[in-house]
Regions:
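Left-handed beta-helix
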Residues: 1-141
C-alpha cells in the first residue's frame, strides 16, 4: 500500500505526538497499560511515559512531584502537583489534582475537572470501574 501511495505522488509525514495537548487512549485500563507496559512499542516515534514532569522515575505527564512524596509502582500522574508528604498507592491514576499530605490507596482514580465557572469538581472511582455502570469500587450502587 505504501508503494502505491508514494507512486501516486503522496508524501507521508510522521507527526510527533508527545508532548501534545490531548491524546485520547481509551479506557482507564488502556492508558494504565500503555504507561506501565506498552510504551516501548512507541519509543521509535518519540513517545515516553515521562513527559514534561519534575521526575525521572514516575510515569507522568505535565506534573510536579516534590522530593519526599511517595508514588508507588504502576501509578500514573498527569497534570498534577504531588507535595512532599503525599503518598500515592500502587496502580493509581491522578489527573488534574493537587495533593499535599493525603494518602491515596492502591487502584484508585482521582480526576479533577475545572468547570466553566472556575470551580473544580473531582470524581473518584476504582481503577477497574466503568463510570457508565452502576458500580463503585467494584460494588453495586
Amino acid at each position: 500500500m505504501w508503494n502505491i501511495i508514494k507512486k501516486n505522488g503522496f508524501k507521508l509525514k510522521q507527526i510527533k505526538l508527545s508532548p501534545s495537548a490531548m491524546i485520547h487512549f481509551g479506557s482507564i485500563p488502556e492508558i494504565m497499560n500503555l504507561m506501565n507496559k506498552g510504551m516501548d512499542d512507541f519509543r521509535d516515534i518519540g513517545w515516553n511515559n515521562i513527559v514534561n514532569s519534575s521526575t525521572d522515575t514516575v510515569n507522568s505527564y505535565n506534573s510536579i512531584l516534590t522530593p519526599g512524596c511517595t508514588v508507588q509502582e504502576n501509578s500514573y500522574i498527569e497534570i498534577s502537583y504531588i507535595h512532599e508528604k503525599a503518598k500515592v498507592g500502587k496502580n493509581s491514576l491522578l489527573s488534574f489534582i493537587e495533593i499535599e499530605d493525603e494518602v491515596i490507596p492502591d487502584d484508585v482514580v482521582i480526576h479533577g475537572l475545572k468547570q466553566n465557572n472556575g470551580k473544580i469538581v473531582c470524581r473518584i472511582f476504582g481503577i477497574n470501574d466503568n463510570p457508565k455502570e452502576e458500580k463503585l469500587f467494584g460494588k453495586a450502587i
